[in-house]
Swiss-Prot record:
Pfam short name (any one): FAD_binding_6
Organism: Cichorium intybus
Tissue: In cortical cells of roots grown at low nitrate concentrations, in vascular tissues of roots at high nitrate concentrations and in root apex under both conditions.
Domain FAD-binding FR-type: 663-775
Gene3D superfamilies named in the record: 2.60.40.650, Cytochrome b5-like heme/steroid binding domain, Nucleotide-binding domain of ferredoxin-NADP reductase (FNR) module, Oxidoreductase, molybdopterin-binding domain, Translation factors
Residues that, per the record, bind heme: H569, H592
InterPro entries: Cbr1-like_FAD-bd_dom, Cyt_B5-like_heme/steroid-bd, Cyt_B5-like_heme/steroid_sf, Cyt_B5_heme-BS, FAD-bd_FR_type, Flavoprot_Pyr_Nucl_cyt_Rdtase, FNR_nucleotide-bd, Ig_E-set
Residues at which FAD binds: 715-718, 732-737, 744, 749-751, 802
The protein's name in its UniProt record: Nitrate reductase [NADH]
Leading EC class: oxidoreductase
Any one GO molecular-function label of the UniProt entry: molybdopterin cofactor binding
Subunit details: Homodimer.
Length: 920
């Protein structure tokens, strides 16, 4: 059904007192009762209803009082027919699991952090005021679990009277303003840019926009109270800083700044907001206090506000420079970093630009063509907005590519401020003849504001994908919704997040396919009602192809048959099989290069039918990944002699043999962190149930998954804990800090994220993955084929010791396993040797079975009795067994070590590295 925007003119009730719309507060995060719902005030809130004596310069709120009844009526309407928020299962195991959220919100960055927008048609159905649960959300990390009583906001820097205000002081000691403001993310409509060329941002659709009635303290009053200095004394910028601890820049708060002229301008209506739509802020929207800067992008409106600092330079926050910029189109990520484009002030975004969107017809809406529909006009609808308080004065629609334009009817539901500013979106509509739609190939819209700014015809790409405001185009196609009847199906350019659909996605993949000259690919469509010869499948059909006999995956709405690639996949066949029969868009994008993405096109067999289907990735369902199933039953039987595990003991990583369609990410909470050295940490993570074992076969590893800087990051790790540990597993991780290694100035993304994690926060794991599995007593399974050895030449470099360690531990626990292990372990210095105590203890206790030899690039202590330099042929001949039928070599370490030291020297020793070398 087409989305519609009702005509909701405000009623004017001049007799309503100011107290009639004051909202109550409770000291916790749950939404308080409100007089809008005819509820009684709690005693603690009565202080807010008592008129306060204000200084003579207090802002005159008489106009606000006249509008309050209008706001109340609009809020009531917007909240009607809104489903309740719930504790979403997708938040379980994350730092946000205590927050209730609306289940219809479209998640854009997986499970965590929570970045979301409402379905576009649902957003418009609620009209001018957006219900708080449907307001778009932009979070960079976990939501602070704040309390009203303990929260303070510090004012410092270039002020005469630095102060720290409690929430009670902000409410009682300052005048307040309450008025509607439209908030828009600078990334609104970014997915259109990503489908032109990938940016560094995630996929916002066209619903990264919302309007609320905000109430708070004018910033200018707070700065005056604290005695802000003049420009002559260096006060040039006002910086805002939030409470959350974020990974950006190696660890920082979210912060930004505006010029002092903006901060002190009463016409800007900048407030410290503590109420939204008549109630205290919800956690996702900044409880207990946030900035509202009307007419600006949402990225300047710091949530969970903790500090306001008046400074000479602009904010030095990582997020002030590395976010919310529109760089020239030729600047890519490498150039931006190498030439310092992030720090050029002319590319910062403050005020919104002019923009408009078609919301009716909605995506994949079908208009039947019959005697009834052709006798009456069809109404096109949408929204428009501009920045800086500029009024939208005109919206035009074209159905012939811009040759002619039709002027639309505008519906401005707000009154101008006393400074003639317009802070909210407006709605537009246009009646068109259905016969005109029949002849149109597309419908496009553009808006104008009072300074005659308008939207460009074509998209202008930029690295961050921000401020996209080209004409919004809806394509039309003929279809047959019912037998003997024709209709028009409408197609929006994109669908938000990793949802499939949209004419831009279809054209993008057709373009790629044309470049690859794929002979069998037909034109694809996203609607099942179109009369077409292309192969389309439902998700239920895809799920049937979840085995080695037929392994299908879905990526960006396109279906790929990877069966023939199983044997060639670098990560082994189970790297694909764990994913077979699922939509793995998010995780595929997280770990694959552009080369791999182009290679994937060779295996495309059709398109996913998207109508009525929400992809697993878009919904952050746990059943998406890119890697690995394992033969758990064989492992369990083969290693039963190591240690008996109760038959009823559950495992966290459920094997494919037991649950072929279950491929879940497992949330695991950090319960301890031990510093092993200056850059090595031992992390212990709790499994979901205290009586579980991890269930990871020896030799396999897991993916650790986290959303970092709004993108899914996945890294493979081998736990150092033994397979029979109950309730937890451990990871030994080397932290690659920013600014230490010149070749990698930004350091390790995942390792720094793990380092920044607080106890109680969570990551997700998925697996098992890997093509090598130790079955016990000298037997390995490699790509499903068995190999046997009595002697193992084991080479490790740096953190590559962890797979060897897990293997060693399992060998030594089985008294019947007489496999001999010869370990050569390379590091930079003695201090970099991991788990040396364990290795030396094993070599001492099992001297007939375990030999360990260390190699360091440079010794930093006297008396070093092992090798110095690199692994050489002489070292290998002296410390690993000669080639024989019952000898295997195992290696895990940096690629240069394996390529230039291990491989050539093993060949010199007579090893067949193709068949006798296993690389983890």
């Amino acid at each position: 059904m087409a989305a519609s925007v009702e005509n909701r003119q405000f009623r004017h009730e001049p007799g309503l007192s100011a107290a009639g719309v004051v909202r109550s507060f409770s000291p916790n995060h749950r939404r308080s009762d409100s007089p809008i719902r005819n509820c009684n005030y709690p005693a603690a809130a009565r202080e807010f209803m008592t008129p306060k004596k204000l200084p003579p310069e207090t802002y005159d709120t008489s106009d606000d009082e006249e509008d309050e009844a209008d706001y109340r009526d609009a809020i009531k309407k917007s909240n009607s027919e809104l489903e309740s928020s719930v504790f979403d299962p997708r938040d379980q195991g994350t730092a946000d699991q205590w927050i209730e959220r609306n289940p219809s919100m479209v998640r854009l960055t997986g499970k965590h952090p929570f970045n979301s927008e409402p379905p576009l048609n649902k957003l418009m159905q609620h009209g001018f005021i957006t219900p708080d649960p449907l307001h778009y959300v932009r979070n960079h990390g976990p939501v602070p679990n704040a309390t009203w009583e303990d929260w303070t906001v510090e004012i410092c820097g270039l002020v005469k009277r630095p102060a720290r205000f409690s929430m009670t002081q902000l409410v009682n000691e300052f005048p307040s303003r309450e008025f509607p403001v439209t908030l828009v993310c600078a990334g609104n409509r970014r997915k259109e840019q990503n489908l032109t060329k990938q940016t560094i941002g995630f996929n916002w659709g066209a619903a990264g926009i919302s309007t609320s009635v905000w109430k708070g303290v004018p910033l200018v009053h707070i700065l005056k109270r604290c005695g802000i200095y003049s420009r002559k004394k260096g006060a040039l910028n006002v910086c805002f800083e939030g409470a959350e601890d974020l990974p950006g820049g190696g660890g920082s708060k979210y912060g930004t700044s505006i010029k002092i002229e903006m901060a002190m301008d009463p016409a800007r209506d900048i407030i410290l907001a503590y109420m939204q739509n008549g109630e205290k802020l919800s956690p996702d929207h900044g409880f207990p206090v946030r900035m509202i800067i009307p007419g600006f992008i949402g990225g300047r409106m710091v949530k969970w506000l903790k500090r306001i600092i008046v400074t000479t330079p602009e904010s030095e926050s990582y997020y002030h420079f590395k976010d919310n910029r529109v760089l020239p189109s030729h600047v890519d990520a490498e150039l931006a970093n190498s030439e310092g484009w992030w720090y050029k002030p002319e590319y910062i975004i403050n005020e919104l630009n002019i923009n408009s969107v078609i919301t009716t017809p909605c995506h994949e809406e079908i208009l039947p063509i019959n005697s009834w529909t052709t006798q009456r006009p069809y109404t096109l609808r949408g929204y428009a907005y501009s920045g800086g308080g500029k009024k939208v004065t005109r919206v035009e629609v074209t159905m012939d590519g811009g040759e002619t334009w039709n002027v639309c009817t505008l519906d401005h539901k707000e009154k101008p401020t006393r400074y003639a500013k317009y802070w909210c979106w407006c709605f537009w509509s246009l009646e068109v003849e259905v016969l005109d739609l029949l002849s149109a190939k597309e419908i496009a819209v553009r808006a104008w504001d009072e300074t005659l700014n308008t939207q460009p015809d074509k998209l202008i790409w930029n690295l961050m994908g921000m401020m996209n405001n080209c004409w919004f185009r809806v394509k039309t196609n003929m279809c047959k919704p019912h037998k003997g009847e024709i209709g028009i199906v409408f197609e929006h350019p994109t669908q938000p997040g990793n949802q499939s659909g949209g004419w831009m996605a279809r054209e993008k993949h057709l373009e790629i396919s044309s470049e690859l000259a794929h002979p069998t690919l037909k034109k694809s469509v996203s609607s099942p009602f179109m009369n077409t010869t292309s192969l389309t499948f439902t998700m239920s059909e895809v799920k049937k192809h979840n085995s080695a006999d037929s392994a299908w995956i879905v990526v960006h709405g396109h279906i790929y048959d990877c069966t023939s690639f199983l044997k060639d996949h670098p990560g082994g066949s189970d790297s694909i099989l764990l994913n077979a029969g699922t939509d793995c868009t998010e995780e595929f994008d997280a770990i694959h290069s552009d080369k791999a993405k182009k290679l994937l096109e060779e295996y495309r067999v059709g398109e996913l039918i998207t109508m009525g289907y929400s992809s697993d990735s878009a919904a952050s369902s746990p059943n998406n990944s890119v890697h690995g199933a394992t033969n758990y039953l064989t492992l369990h039987l083969s290693l039963a002699t190591i240690k008996e595990i109760a038959p009823t003991r559950s495992v966290a990583l459920i094997p494919k043999e037991i649950a072929p369609t279950r491929r879940e990410k497992i949330p695991c909470k950090l319960i301890s962190k031990t510093s092993v050295s200056h850059d090595v940490r031992l992390f212990r993570f709790a499994l979901p149930s205290p009586d579980q074992v991890l269930g990871l076969p020896v030799g396999k590893h897991v993916f650790v998954c986290a959303t970092i800087d709004d993108k899914l990051c996945m890294r493979a790790y081998t736990p150092t804990s033994t397979i029979d540990e109950v309730g937890y597993f451990e990871l030994l991780v080397k932290i690659y800090f920013k600014g230490v290694e010149p070749k990698f100035p930004n350091g390790g993304l995942m390792s720094q994220h793990l380092e920044s994690m607080e106890l109680g926060s969570s990551i997700e794991i998925k697996g098992p993955l890997g093509h090598i599995e130790y079955m016990g007593r000298g037997t390995f399974s490699v790509h499903g084929k068995q190999k046997f050895a009595r002697k193992l030449a084991m080479f490790a470099g740096g953190t590559g010791i962890t797979p060897d360690l897990s293997s060693d531990a399992s060998y030594l626990k089985d008294p019947e396993d007489d496999t001999e292990m010869y370990v050569v372990y390379a590091n930079r210095t003695e201090d970099d040797i991991l788990l040396r105590e364990e290795l030396d203890a094993w070599a001492d206790k099992y001297s007939d079975r375990v030999k360990v030899w260390y190699v360091v690039a440079k010794s930093i202590r006297e008396g070093w009795k092992y090798s110095e330099g690199f692994i050489t042929e002489d070292i290998m001949r002296e410390h690993v067994p000669e080639v024989s039928e019952d000898t295997l070599a195992l290696a895990c370490g940096p690629p240069p070590m394996i390529q230039f030291a291990i491989n050539p020297n093993l060949e010199k020793m007579g090893y067949d590295i193709k068949n006798s070398l296993l690389v983890f």
